């Protein structure tokens, strides 16, 4: 559906050339929600703007719907862009016209027949649950409602791809969740492919199927959201994963606790998150776990949790208990054994 092949982007400034993208390649499958996450300056905004050629790449190929956009004429590119919708952090609504007209006007400019315009505007305003505000002006809407209008406008052209450029970063947490739920609903009901960029791990974990992590203009790690959460490799990825869990154990506390036992991080995914495996382990083996911190969250359609424990007991008993937990589908990290390299909350 979307493929970037060795895409680079160099901006020329008074101080010299700035390489915003460095030979970046990635693939987005048809019908999935693909997230790109990175800190400010990572290159994610440049990347997503290259997908519809709002930014023309310096080198590389952009393939969308089996068309290499970098080879198209101006007329051909304009036609191809009709199948690529985009929403932004700023809503870009026309302040002097109604919600209805904000959606209808671009369709008129595109030459869509009047009856078809009426049909589409009603259809997509109902999808975003704003049909009852069709005669309102943008100044009368909340931030979340404005973004819903922007989403309806993008969908009214009936694209196959929807690009989201930090669409929720200006919204409060509750409104962000409602917009994410709406995007997930659109993906599941309409089947549209969504490519989004964000600096918030909450966005990735709530609606994405796969994710790419960017740093300094390059993709440093990518995979399914489940794999990224349960087995992050790059240091930047680990920071993002840890940001989803508020707990942090001070180094001094860790050092003191490690004198009397092992600090272990247990990760639960899917069905294992609801099983009393730790309780069973304490009955089966002579180990005494003390819970230091814990959290459970949702990765799109399955639960994911982390539990940091201080486990006391004879080393042999601890080893057997941790092996038992792994057999129950729990990911075990930390401690003095080879169950993991480090405690993620350290």
Swiss-Prot record:
Its main location: membrane. Keywords: Amino-acid transport, ATP-binding, Cell membrane, Membrane, Nucleotide-binding, Translocase, Transport. GO terms for cellular component: plasma membrane. Residues 2-241 form the ABC transporter domain. ATP binds at residues 38-45. Part of the ABC transporter complex MetNIQ involved in methionine import. Responsible for energy coupling to the transport system. Belongs to the ABC transporter superfamily. Methionine importer (TC 3.A.1.24) family. This is Methionine import ATP-binding protein MetN 1. The lineage of its organism: Bacteria, Bacillati, Bacillota, Bacilli, Bacillales.
């Amino acid at each position: 559906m979307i493929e970037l092949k060795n895409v680079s982007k160099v901006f020329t400034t008074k101080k010299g050339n700035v390489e915003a993208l460095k030979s970046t390649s990635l693939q987005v499958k048809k019908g999935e929600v693909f997230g790109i996450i990175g800190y400010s300056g990572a290159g994610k905004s440049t990347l997503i703007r290259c997908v519809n050629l709002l930014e023309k790449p310096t080198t590389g190929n952009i393939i969308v719907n089996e068309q290499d956009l970098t080879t198209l004429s101006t007329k051909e590119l304009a036609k191809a862009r009709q199948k690529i919708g985009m929403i932004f952090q700023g809503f870009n609504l026309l302040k002097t016209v109604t919600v209805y007209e904000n959606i209808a006007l671009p369709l008129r400019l595109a030459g869509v027949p009047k009856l078809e315009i009426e049909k589409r505007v009603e259809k997509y305003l109902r999808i975003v649950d704003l049909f009852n505000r069709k005669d309102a002006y943008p100044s009368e809407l909340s931030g979340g409602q404005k973004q819903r209008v922007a989403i309806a406008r993008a969908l009214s052209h009936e694209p196959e791809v929807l690009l989201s450029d930090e669409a929720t970063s200006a919204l409060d947490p509750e409104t962000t969740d409602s917009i994410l739920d709406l995007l997930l609903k659109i993906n599941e009901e309409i089947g549209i492919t969504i490519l989004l960029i964000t600096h918030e791990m909450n966005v990735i974990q709530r609606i994405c199927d796969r994710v790419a992590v960017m740093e300094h203009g390059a993709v440093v790690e990518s995979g399914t959201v489940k794999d990224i959460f349960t087995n992050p490799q790059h240091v930047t990825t680990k920071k993002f994963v840890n940001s989803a869990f508020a707990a942090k154990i001070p180094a001094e506390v860790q050092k003191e606790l490690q004198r009397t036992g092992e600090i272990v991080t247990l990760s639960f995914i899917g069905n294992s998150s609801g099983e009393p495996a730790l309780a069973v382990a304490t009955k089966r083996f002579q180990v005494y776990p003390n819970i230091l911190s814990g959290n459970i969250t949702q990765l799109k359609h399955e639960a994911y949790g982390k539990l940091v424990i201080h486990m006391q007991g004879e080393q042999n008993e601890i080893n057997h208990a941790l092996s038992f937990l792994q057999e129950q589908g729990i990911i075990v990290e930390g401690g003095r054994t080879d169950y993991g390299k480090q405690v993620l909350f350290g």
